[in-house]
Amino acid sequence: MSRFIRYLPFFIGLGLLPVLHACVDQYDPGLTANTNLLVVEGIVTDQSSVQTISLSRSRSSRDSLTKIPIQRAAVTVLVNGSTPVRLSEVEPGIYQFPAGFKGQVGQSYQLRFRTEQGVAYESSVETMVPVPPVLRAYDTFNEQGIRTTADSRPVPTNDVYVDFQDPGAQTNFYLWRWRLYESQRWCATCEQGRYTLTDLGPVGSGPINVLGCVRDTTLGIFNLFDYPCRGLCWDIFYSTDVNVFADLNADGRLQVGRKVASIPIYQRDQALLVIEQLSLSPNAYRYYKLFADQTQNTGTLADTPPAPTVGNVRNLADPNENVVGYFSAASVAVLPYKLTRQNVTTGSYQGLFYAINRRLPNVESPRNGGSSAGVGVPSAICIPSRTRTDLLPPGW
């Protein structure tokens, strides 16, 4: 079952990925109570996009879970056992490879880092293996879809499948992930405030000065005003399920109808799904499979598994320390797939804004000339981030 629907109301408000930094798979592990675990999250790929590794510490109690970034660590990835690549911290706990870096099939990678306190860690060596291309993708309309946790009502979905040719005479391990571009018509919400911008000229075609939400104490403290987008805008969502497969009983066969996504339908607008098919090492596959079995197959990602899923990173001075997460290397086959939604035959859809906020937009009344915030009602800028873009999605 897709977790897209379960966390949708939080995606924009928390500024998430939710979770993935470019080429990094980030899966928050279920933790037992009263734990303090180091979490390593990262996949080196052969894609040209920015690649990062995340280091954090998860502290849990019976009623809370806190994720604290590990800052100012010295992070290096050793390529082929001899060439060190130094990463730089670009956000708290997020370490980025140098510009232009991308992995190569056949090369090996090992993560090494030292915390600010001088504790040294290293991963096992991961070798990047090739991955076959996705031959085609297609979707079906599922009227029953998935169910929300709030009211258990079914939300229709586009269920997406892929075909691919598995290479013969070898064992292959796969992981699928995706990112979804949904058109967004509303770009800002102001609480006890008004969205303000001014044209610097020429009006309509020149630069603008964006002040954003400016507080207005004449409004109630819980007053919300919503502002439409000034131009085209897309919200970006990422997969959170762990979807893995081993060809142990299907070596060399054409794989038909592998389900890779169930995308909830909140609007009839077209959307773009970028499908990624990744190759995994045997050890990486075992880790992700165990993680999926302990979380997805026992309820939700919030459920506590029997024990933390320990990965392939170890403390050099204390091998008994449990380090959660997995550092791996994977070749990636990418296929952009357009969800036309022409096969959506039934249902009433209230739009993406309603799905995220559980309410309809509240539009500010037009302003008069006496308002310090300007005249009329402004439209809002689509501010690019990890979960939003004003650029036409690749493959649109």
PLM region spans:
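Bacterial N-terminal signal peptides that target proteins for export
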Residues: 2-12
